[in-house]
Amino acid sequence: FSDGEPITIDDVIFSMYVLCDPTYDGGATLYAQPIQGMAEYRSGMSTMSKYLGELGEGSTDFSVVDEATQKAFWDAVNDGGVKFAQEIVDYMVANSGVAEGDVKSAAAGWGFDGLADDATAKDLFLAIAAKYDWNFSAMEAETAGSALSDLLPADVYATSTKAVTFGESAASITGIQKTGDYSMRVVFTEVSATAVYQLGVVIAPMHYYGEKDKYDYANNKFGFDKGDLSHVRSVTTQPMGAGPYKFVKFENGTVNFEANDSYYLGAPKIKHVNFLESQETDKLNGVVTGTIDITDPSFSSDTVDAIQQQNSNGELNGDKITVNTVDNLGYGYMGISSVAVNVGGDPGSDASKNLRKGLAT
């Protein structure tokens, strides 16, 4: 790693267990793979938000979470959660021709089809929560304006990373097996087409993100207490890895990196590299003025024209700017505005939908 500590298979196993912890709230989905013992390891424990969400409002079961905490949770859902969903509805009304109060159509346009005709903003929020397993951090992706973290009380928002135990669970994932200091085996219960991609986990330094005194593979200790990733989260603002550059600091919209002298291929020749947060409109101008060395603007006709105007030879490669392009395999799609393309001013009518289908067929 960039601090000179050698990498071993324990770092890989630690990283996998973090990604498979019931309270993990990041974007990786290794836990969804059919790995032997995964279900048994994750059973009997979940985040408090998922537990309360699935328990439901008005529950009288206070054996795991007390009544006051449950009430505070649902009060937050009925206030901040509803506001979060209402912003989506309002956005769809303002921009997509959805009728005022038509939550069902607004939700469908946002990717949540199947709500009842008389659906409310709360119903939409519950649908969003179900999609993301009540992971408030992941639900932020659905925002139409406000951050969910600004709409929910901090203690309620934190329930999506706080563990609750309500049953028995296995102490380890039997399919994750250490076979040596630099080797391991992962056992699947069935064929998984995506396994080859999911197993490519980023190897995080256990001695930094975890706690070394809590790692003992033979005794089912994997660098942290199951259900408690607080130490992992506490150092994520100062990341450490094993790449060619190491993180120095982030301030004023700039990430500062410096060469990693411990990099396995040798230290990079460029000692310092800075990444700047940039708006699309500032990228090309930054290169022209010299505040940015390299950037990746959207390669539109306007950008091409602007580059050619800056170069004295009127080409994409000249005395001021050099352009490197690559071919990408991909696909795109066209969208049709229901506000602009409809029959009789009613974007939601069957005739309007058929018109748009006809144009797209």
Q: What are these regions, as identified by a protein language model?
A:
Residues 197-198, 347:
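Short conserved micro-motifs at the rims of enzyme active sites and ligand-binding pockets
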Residues 53-65, 163-176:
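Extracellular adhesion/glycan-binding regions together with long Ser/Thr-
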Residues 2, 192-195:
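Primarily extracytoplasmic ectodomains and periplasmic/lumenal surface modules that are beta-strand-rich
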Residues 42-56, 216-220, 236-238, 341-343:
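Short, charged low-complexity intrinsically disordered segments located at boundaries
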Residues 1-148, 286, 348-358:
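Aromatic- and charge-enriched surface segment that lines or borders ligand/interaction sites
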Residues 1-25, 81, 162, 172, ...:
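Extracytoplasmic/periplasmic ligand-capture domains
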Residues 40-43, 229-235, 294, 302-304:
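A general structural signal for short secondary-structure boundary/capping elements
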Residues 141-174, 180-183, 187-192, 200-268, ...:
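Gly/Pro-rich hinge or "lid" segments in bacterial periplasmic/extracellular proteins
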